[in-house]
């Protein structure tokens, strides 16, 4: 992608900041983010770039029409991205993730945007009995967060069918990488485990640790966003690596890389959590998505990032 004018909602977030960084290499980027879950620190190295514009407000509060006018594409990542947080406060999740998405779609339709790329989630599948998740399977949301993402997908489909707005929905599977926040009470498992084991703290595992995830390095997600935007494809696509890692294996890998032998603490499973998550990613091959990488090598890069961050803070 080159010489385009694009919007990234949630562009200060973990995934959004990586996408913003890549897009800025050849495009004009407007980031909309109120730092509800993102951080300006994630893009501080980009702030001097003359092709970057920042709108430091919530998509819920803004009139998006003026901002979207003259823009080519909208990458919609802004959300409250947490299953347990949605269980605790479903109303806030619905407002940010459903109302926010509807506002984005309306403004995109009215402003002549060429395509909306919507960040969805593998959580929409829930605990469907078939292990390998395919896009044509019925969704079975197990949490308010998953419901908001399934609803966002349906809004995207309806806006394409009724109004002719091209949309594509990317179902991310357990994304990890640098800049992921380990400190929130709703933090994802990989940054939480890395920082805990670095500090000789026992990782807390919900359940027996044999639940598995299709962990996806953030750079693959960035590539998927750009490829899907440039293509003529629309609809729903899984974005993952189609590899199955258990939580117990994850802890073992982190211990091995850090040269530690920290024992886990196992407690009861959480409401809304699912047992297994593994993607069939063949459909995303239609727009050229073909992730290549070794999980342990990617994990080493993330651990190195956290070690550098800790050393620089001293």
Each model region followed by its residue ranges:
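N-terminal Rossmann-like NAD(P)+-binding domain of SDR-like oxidoreductases, especially those catalyzing
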Residues: 1-175, 301, 309
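C-terminal substrate-binding subdomain of Rossmann-fold SDR/epimerase-dehydratase oxidoreductases
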Residues: 58, 197-314
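A conserved pocket-lining segment of Rossmann-fold NAD(P)-dependent short-chain dehydrogenase/reductase
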Residues: 86, 136, 166-167, 171-181, ...
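Active-site loop immediately N-terminal to the catalytic Tyr-X3-Lys motif
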Residues: 90, 141, 182-183, 232
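A short, amphipathic alpha-helix embedded in the catalytic core of nucleotide-handling enzymes
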Residues: 104, 159, 189, 193-196, ...
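Short beta-loop-alpha junction of Rossmann-like oxidoreductase domains
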Residues: 127-129, 178-180, 283
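Hydrophobic alpha-helix immediately C-terminal to the catalytic Tyr-X-X-X-Lys motif of short-chain
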Residues: 151, 155, 159, 189, ...
